[in-house]
Design a protein with these regions (language model features):
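Glycine-rich phosphate-binding loops of nucleotide-dependent enzymes
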Residues: 2-250
């Protein structure tokens, strides 16, 4: 029996007559950053939805931290430490960066956040939120409304919010999407540090980032995994080149 923190066992998802993920089996090992790549419409985001509980699988099993979480709702999986970011930034734009993170920190503690209060009035909350912002180079932007931050800053903020939940495994859905070159590089540096602390599942279209970061890469095409292995083995795989990467990746 595998000791992998996350095990996907023959999971499928249908939308009407369309099978979006098809018999996907995959283990995410402790200490690895595992990238999932594939063309648009391959089922990558649906797969993340299934893992996180945002969408229920129609069949198959999802084992997380030794427990079958296949039928658990998203909030319960998050409480267990299976935490995701969203492909579309899900921050509170009118609240400051500090307040966004503070809300997440307080939610982790099980208490409600006062939307009319100020995070700085709660020293422990403030300190925890500022520590996360500092880690992402956002301390100087703590008081800025999140809606006024650059796209790259929002993506960093979103990961900081996810980390406030103290995840055991982090699911990241295209964190580099829409970022500038400099913003992308900062995020890559951040992920290089994060991967030392916890396993990460990364959905990403930026192949340079994928091959720089990933320990293993799985390729999803038409809802099925056609290859899984080291970045170099994926580069060298003729079926992958034909289906997705293109011959120029050879």
């Amino acid at each position: 029996m595998s000791n992998a923190p996350l095990q996907l066992q023959n999971i499928c998802k249908n939308y009407g007559a369309l099978r979006v993920t098809d018999d996907v089996s995959l283990n995410i090992e402790a200490g690895e950053l595992h990238a999932i790549i594939g063309p648009n419409g391959a089922g990558k985001t649906t797969l993340i939805h299934q893992i996180s509980g945002h969408a229920q699988s129609d069949s198959g099993r999802i084992i997380f931290d030794g427990q079958d979480v296949s039928r658990l709702p998203m909030a319960e999986r998050a409480r267990m430490g299976l935490v995701r970011s969203f492909q579309i930034t899900s921050i509170l734009p009118r609240f400051s960066a500090l307040e966004n993170v503070a809300i997440a920190v307080q939610a982790r503690s099980g208490s409600s956040f006062s939307f009319f209060g100020n995070a700085s009035k709660e020293p422990a909350l403030n300190d925890a939120a500022m520590a996360l912002l500092s880690r992402f180079g956002l301390a100087a932007r703590a008081g800025v409304p999140a809606g006024q931050m650059s796209h790259g800053e929002k993506r960093q903020l979103e990961i900081a919010i996810a980390l406030a939940a103290k995840p055991k495994l982090l699911l990241l859905d295209e964190p580099l999407a829409g970022t500038s070159h400099d913003e992308s590089q900062r995020l890559i540096n951040t992920l290089q540090e994060l991967r030392k602390e916890l396993p990460i599942v990364l959905i990403e279209h930026d192949m340079d980032a994928v091959f720089a970061l990933a320990d293993r890469v799985s390729v999803l095409v038409y809802g099925r995994i056609i290859a899984s292995g080291s970045p170099q083995s994926i580069r060298d795989n003729a079926e992958v080149r034909a289906a997705y990467l293109g011959e120029e990746a050879a």
